[in-house]
Each structure stands twice: as structure tokens, then as C-alpha cells.
């Protein structure tokens, strides 16, 4: 016969396990944190240029459109000058409503010019679905940069925006820098892309992919972060004299997060 003490211990362990899973699944994945950083990019005294950066939306049965819409609404409230999307827009684990997804994304381009790159979840599932992602972004007014560059011009400033292909697909092949010698911002899904671009001129790289580790285990860290260089799992970090910013992302795999809230990022470039 089980003792009262062991029964209470087993009951407490069951409750703790259930509560922990409930928190990871029902609480933290929808608890967005608005992150702000001011970065010396132009190195002038003009007003800050505001960029909204979102990545890893991961529309799926685990990440509903309502959650993605909430993240977008929070970002738009900050009145950005430019919006950048860092890849991994879906998980192809179910039939997805791409028309509804386009409707959710449309407010971004209505707010500010919006550019995107692709991530590893956007490319390995066949040409038809890759085509659907590209068409969905396009129908929402979003421009995809696939190893392409464009010049972003404001009344007082210019900089070159580069979007790369996915590193894991062997498609990270950025174009040469322009001859104008402008500040260069790179949009690359995976922060390990820095190694491919080590000898290329750039000043700031914006990445996703890691989800910040998604499950941050006390005393262990981020054992599940899918990158070679763990220094760039999350946040703003130096790479020599350059900087890499890795967002924790909006969505998640399997709808779980622990000590790693989803993120809406506002960057002010000065």
C-alpha cells in the first residue's frame, strides 16, 4: 500500500509536470515581448530610422493566425519606417489557408515598405509549396529578396538592404556590394550565415531561425538551438566590428516555449 507521503509526492510531481507543460504551451507562446534597440548604423545626428523586425512566424496548427496577427498589430503600433521579415513563415504539417495568411500579412505593407527573405522551413517541401509561400508574400504586398539587394532611400539617408537565400539549402549567395559604398544591412535567416559572408562588406545582420533556443533550461542554457555558433542564439552580439541581431521569433515548433518569450523587435538606426 502506498504511503501518504509518497502519494503526496507523486501527486505534487504530476501537478508540477502538468502545470509546467500548461505554462509552456498555453501561456508563454502568446506572451509577446516588445524589444527595442538603438544602433549606430548611419553615425549621424538625424532622427532614428525605425525598423520592425519579425521572423519565424511558423503558421501551423501550433501557431494560429490569431497569434501572428497579434504580433503584427503590436509591431505596427510602433509606427516603423521599414518592416523586415526573417523567414520561416509556415510549418507544412497541415493544410494551410494561404488566402487567410495573406490577409493577416497585408497590414504590414500597408504600414511601411516590407521586405522578406526565406528560411529553412520555406524551402525543403517541394516547389509547389515554395511557390505558395512566395505568392502569399507577394499578394500581401511584401517584396522577397532572394540573394538580391535594393537601396533604401530616405530624404536624408541611403543604405543597401541585402536579402539572402537559406544557408541550410546551400543558397546563401549574397550579391556583391554596390559601388556606392553605402551602409549595408543583411537579412539572413540563420545567424551562421555570417561565416559565408565573413569576407563580404556589411554592417548589421538581422537573423531568426533559433527561436532564441525556444526552451531555455536553467543551468543548461539553450540545448536545442539549431546553430553551430551558440554565441548568436539571441539578441544583439558583436561580430568583430560588425553586429548581428537574432530575434527569438514570433512562432515556435510544437507550440512550446520555456523562459524564452516570443519577440517583436524594433530597431532604431542612428
Swiss-Prot record:
Annotated cofactor note: Binds 2 divalent metal cations.
Pfam families: Metallophos
GO molecular function, one term: phosphoric diester hydrolase activity
Annotated EC: 3.1.4.-
InterPro entries: Calcineurin-like_PHP_ApaH (IPR004843), Metallo-depent_PP-like (IPR029052), Metallophosphoesterase_sf (IPR051158)
Names of required cofactors: a divalent metal cation
Entry keyword set: Hydrolase, Metal-binding
One annotated GO biological process: lipid A biosynthetic process
Binding sites annotated in the UniProt record for a divalent metal cation 2: 88, 120, 209
Enzyme class: hydrolase
Positions bound to a divalent metal cation 1: 56, 58, 88, 211
GO cellular component: a single term: membrane
Recorded family membership: Belongs to the metallophosphoesterase superfamily.
Purpose of the protein: Shows phosphodiesterase activity, hydrolyzing phosphodiester bond in the artificial chromogenic substrate bis-p-nitrophenyl phosphate (bis-pNPP).
Record's protein name: Phosphodiesterase YaeI
Species, as recorded: Escherichia coli (strain K12)
Gene that this polypeptide is encoded by: yaeI
